[in-house]
């Protein structure tokens, strides 16, 4: 490409026609940095506001920023003038013409008089409401600026020398009455209204249009006020309930503790016998490929045998051993732990044809474990009537009650027989193998898959 062809290229965008300091705002309006808006645009803003047009609509139609529109309207409401250049706006007049005339006379009599001296003289002369010292000083400065001493006008128009510098007072003060927007007062609810709103909020946090109409009729409130109240009430509920349910797991948040523990790996965990059946199964997770065997149950027996206080109802479902204040065989459990009897010796919960503790936990459901625990504790510790309470509950439709009661009776017989054998073994110091019975393997129905 030669130089002639390169010089012949022209940019696609040649710039705006006004050039110079002109800029385009977000709304597409043209403005010049440092220059106030033209007077006709200021006048149009005031006229549109007086006709009831909102400032946001004025901003879009005239392509002037919302902040500029608000500033012009506020200054016009305070001073009655749309002339630019007075930063912060001038203060409205608070003195009467008689006081201004008297202040001007006192100043002419003594040009070096102070503002506080003028105020004292006004009070002595009997003026009922004399202006403050700052107001008198402002009047004195205004009269100095108004004097014909040839000083320059240091307003923005005077400095910039714009085309609006020769605007007359009638153009800068159009005299259009502009209504000040009144702020809505806060709504005060009566006790009856709050009670009706709270009742509706307890039913639903997001009322539909029919609920809002009904509340509007009963409470004599507008639907808009009702909608705002529900929004604020939901926010208050989220604020107060943000950290109240921290630390609760889904398994044990709704269950109630009945003082039953499971001795797993030497620890006792409280069981919640509530809506979900068991509340602390989430705390145990056996290693992959392993099952809970008698070793862990022996640890549970030893831990339960050293329960320190009678105020705790700690027991273990592994050995089904309850507190010594509720079970006379407390010494039996302790001696069994010392002689090394097999774990699960007093456990009548060989539910079905398999021992629960020799089963993988993944093969059990919550309902299976709940029935197993309730039956085991009730047979070993007669003071806990969980089996009676459980029989009063509504049973699922897929349970075989006849098979369950048959298995429960058989387990009770085996448990009593084992307790008698181990009591004799503990009394004579014989080894446990001489009295141990094989686990029941037939005659019962299985309750898990």
Swiss-Prot record:
Disulfide bonds: none
DNA-binding positions: 20-143, 182-241
PAI subdomain: annotated span: 23-79
UniProt keyword annotations, A-Z: Developmental protein, DNA-binding, Homeobox, Nucleus, Paired box, Phosphoprotein, Segmentation polarity protein, Transcription, Transcription regulation
Tissues with expression: Expressed in a single-segment repeat in the neurectoderm during germ-band extension and later in single neurons during neuronal differentiation.
Basic and acidic residues bias: start-end ranges: 141-154
Positions of modified residues (Phosphoserine): 165
Region spans: RED subdomain: 98-143
Residues that span the membrane, as ranges: none
SUPFAM superfamilies: Homeodomain-like (SSF46689)
Region spans: Disordered: 127-187, 294-321
Gene3D superfamilies according to UniProt: Homeodomain-like (1.10.10.60), Winged helix-like DNA-binding domain superfamily/Winged helix DNA-binding domain (1.10.10.10)
Ranges of compositional bias, category Low complexity: 306-320
Cellular component GO terms, alphabetical: nucleus
Domain of life, per lineage: Eukaryota
Biological-process GO terms, alphabetical: nervous system development; neurogenesis; regulation of transcription by RNA polymerase II; segment polarity determination
Pfam families listed in its UniProt record: Homeodomain (PF00046), PAX (PF00292)
Subcellular localization, as worded in the UniProt entry: Nucleus
Gene Ontology MF annotations: DNA binding; DNA-binding transcription factor activity, RNA polymerase II-specific; RNA polymerase II cis-regulatory region sequence-specific DNA binding; RNA polymerase II transcription regulatory region sequence-specific DNA binding
Major subcellular location class: nucleus
Role noted for this protein: Expressed in a segmentally repeating pattern to define the polarity of embryonic segments.
Family: Belongs to the paired homeobox family.
Protein name: Protein gooseberry-neuro
Annotated source species: Drosophila melanogaster (Fruit fly)
Gene behind the chain: gsb-n
């Amino acid at each position: 490409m030669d130089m002639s062809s390169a010089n012949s290229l022209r940019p696609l965008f040649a710039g705006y026609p006004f050039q110079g300091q002109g800029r385009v705002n977000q709304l597409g309006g043209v403005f010049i940095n440092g220059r106030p808006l033209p007077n006709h645009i200021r006048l149009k803003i005031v006229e549109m506001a007086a006709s009831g047009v909102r400032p946001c609509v004025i901003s879009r139609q005239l392509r002037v920023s919302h902040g500029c529109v608000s500033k012009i309207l506020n200054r016009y409401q305070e001073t009655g003038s749309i002339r630019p250049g007075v930063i912060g706006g001038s203060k409205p007049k608070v003195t009467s013409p008689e006081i201004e005339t008297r202040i001007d006379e006192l100043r002419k009599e003594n040009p070096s008089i102070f503002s506080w001296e003028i105020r004292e003289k006004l009070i002595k002369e009997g003026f009922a409401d004399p202006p403050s010292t700052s107001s008198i000083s402002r009047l004195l400065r205004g009269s100095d600026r108004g004097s014909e001493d040839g000083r320059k006008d240091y307003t923005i128009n005077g400095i910039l020398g714009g085309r609006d510098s020769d605007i007359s007072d009638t153009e800068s003060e159009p005299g259009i009455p502009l209504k000040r927007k009144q702020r809505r007062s806060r709504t005060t609810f009566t006790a009856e209204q709050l009670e009706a709103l709270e009742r509706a909020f307890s039913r639903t946090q997001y009322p539909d249009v029919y609920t809002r109409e009904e509340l509007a009729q009963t409470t004599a409130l507008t639907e808009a006020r009702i909608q705002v109240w529900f929004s604020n009430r939901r926010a208050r509920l989220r604020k107060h309930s943000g950290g109240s349910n921290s630390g609760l797991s889904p398994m044990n948040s709704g269950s109630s503790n009945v003082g039953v523990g499971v001795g797993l790996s030497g620890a006792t965990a409280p069981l919640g016998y509530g809506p979900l059946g068991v509340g602390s199964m989430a705390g145990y997770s056996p290693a992959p490929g392993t099952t809970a065997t008698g070793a862990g149950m022996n640890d549970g027996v030893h831990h339960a045998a050293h329960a320190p206080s009678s105020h705790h109802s700690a027991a273990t479902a592994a050995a089904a051993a309850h507190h010594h204040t509720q079970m006379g065989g407390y010494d039996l459990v302790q001696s069994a732990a010392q002689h090394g009897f097999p774990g699960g010796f007093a456990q009548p919960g060989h539910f079905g044809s398999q021992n629960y503790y020799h089963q993988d936990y993944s093969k059990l459901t919550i309902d299976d474990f709940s029935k197993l625990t309730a039956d085991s504790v009730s047979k070993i510790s007669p003071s806990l009537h969980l089996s009676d309470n459980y029989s009063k509950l509504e049973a699922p439709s897929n349970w075989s009650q006849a098979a369950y009661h048959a298995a429960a009776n058989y387990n009770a017989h085996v448990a009593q027989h084992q307790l008698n054998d181990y009591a004799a073994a503990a009394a004579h110091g014989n080894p446990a193998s001489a009295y141990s019975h094989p686990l029941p393997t037939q005659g019962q129905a299985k309750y898990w898959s």
